């Protein structure tokens, strides 16, 4: 028996207990301070006096505020040699990572910059993952003007959330970086490195991360990371690799000066090899007061590779002429194999565990539990699928603006063109067993499908802006735009079981899946008219917009009116059905009012109102059934109406004295003719038929939010932050019909999110305690459905202690609780404990050795629970469990001395 992991566990436990019992001693870090208006500190020279051998220095603050900018001091946050920027976000009041995305005061951060330029344009996560904390001087968070407003000098009140990372000037002109090599138990490894050099007008950053510890992000076809990807532990067993390069160069002139030229870009290769296992349980509530239960068990294995390159060229040709060009290219290769077992029951189970699915798999012929007092099995499905998809994507963006006069008459052009080509080959082998029907069913016992799909998507848009200064206004802007969207896909689909032989037997073809017939003419015999499809979607738009922009004494107002002429056409040729060629001419209208009032004393107020109309996609009006999934038939509706939306929001934010930050917002949305689905479930066959319909009387939503953070002492040794989000939605929904047609009922949805956290620096201690609660409930006007609710609570505790001899001990304990009213939660309690010990060596502490222990209690998974209008859900995904890893971390610099 290998006792090495157990000995490591014991050692870490003893050290953790020691750190909890050690006596805290407060000390002051001697260093420079940052002058701030809000704290009214005196200049450094006045605060630091020469007292012979002794020097008195003020305490380093975690952050200071300058008007609407918050500046976080990285050296005051207690970073270790191995910490990256993302590891320090939780210690910065006002910043948080939520669902993998970075937020500032409750708003999503759209740009992460390094010394004022984007680290990687369009991606806010690369800098968080790859910038080591020790080379960072400070981090600035603020709301900024858009690039277009900066160039034109016309501010319409739009702002974007920006995080600007300022590097330490002592590394100016030198190469700095770090290398982290780690290997551990259970064959876990993590290798990552970063190298960076920068001057006043250039920067080059090279990075690479390679790991199988489950730290990854998922990406879109365009090569961009999904907002919910996130760094951290993913589900399943994942190998993740991400080498890349980011750079910037300008000719030394200041932005806005004649002749200014800058080029910045990035490129890289990303790989994700993923092996996952998950279980899901869904209960649907029917109109007769009963329910159906669906259980799924799935294993997947996939590989994803992304090659990407981005470039941006900026040129201020003259003081009146500006040009920006941004090309992009990416290629995404995705291969997937999955195995799924799924069953449905008419009714529910007392414990709602997964034992009924396991038992049914052991008795697939007779079915179990069948005709029991609790539930009746109606369908068992076994599925094996393969997919091989490649996608090329290229995009070109051009922006040109020309000032025409001294009083800023201006003509601008913005053009964007994008093209995507995709090619996918897919095999899908499904076997169905039905228990409740004795008559012929529309669901066949076996589906052995093969399809080849080629798609071409083309987007082209041009906008011309004319800005005219008018007395009393900053600008009157007229905009004409034209847009073309064209999507064409051709899918050739086949039912291989129609060829007989091994193709018509699930168990015989399972080891051969992906193998195609070799005899001539098999395509004609096996052709599948339900999935063979030639689809062309075309949309042409001409838009006319005018803006009245006013700005004076901190008040900015933008009133806009937009009218768009739209022509939509769909060519829908499906199998043996008659071709459909629907088209539509329509007009869409949008009215917008955006106001912003900024003051230095009482903060910033914002108000916006927007009204707009939108058409349902023509594809939703197609009445031919979508039978890609035999158990779920989808129908369109040619009578769908135009949607109308009213949206208003009010916001306020202020940076107060002594580092306090406060922001709040209220949004109200009303929409009419919202598109939803009306469903009918057949208890005998297990088939659900859905149809798209408009909801009458509309629905509305009210969502307030509040964010507050404050130091609890003058030295900012202890900081508190909190956020509250609430959402109230009131509207109508359809029951799931089974004994009769689905009926409308009123429903009210409440969702509450509360977060509070305390971070403290007490001498050699760095402590953090965060708690997040989320509660959701749905109340219904019908007696058929009970009210449902779900609850989630996550408590996160972090501790860091610096021992003698440059040794640092860290521990993180996260405890989660999940609850679903009347429903089963797979793992209602989960506690994850991570810990590490880091020892620095050499005179400059450039070498460190870290012993990391992950998931000491071996409870990591991804448990999810939720409620919806007509259902509740519980899910579980496997994760990387307990491992111990030894790291060697070396940081280097070519700077002498």
Model region roles, listed by residue range:
Residues 65-70, 80-82, 87-90, 150-151, ...:
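Start-of-domain marker
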Residues 101-149, 162-169, 202:
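Periplasmic plug
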Residues 69-87, 114-119, 180-185, 251:
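Short, polar/charged loop or turn motifs at beta-strand boundaries
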Residues 10-19:
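Bacterial N-terminal signal peptides
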Residues 20-24:
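Sec/Tat signal peptide C-region and signal peptidase I cleavage site
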Residues 26-78, 97-99, 105-109, 143, ...:
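Short, acidic, small-residue-rich periplasmic hinge/interaction motif at the N-terminus
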Residues 122-125, 145-187, 202-656, 660-897:
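Primarily recognizes Gram-negative and organellar outer-membrane beta-barrels
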Residues 1-10:
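Bacterial N-terminal signal peptides that target proteins for export
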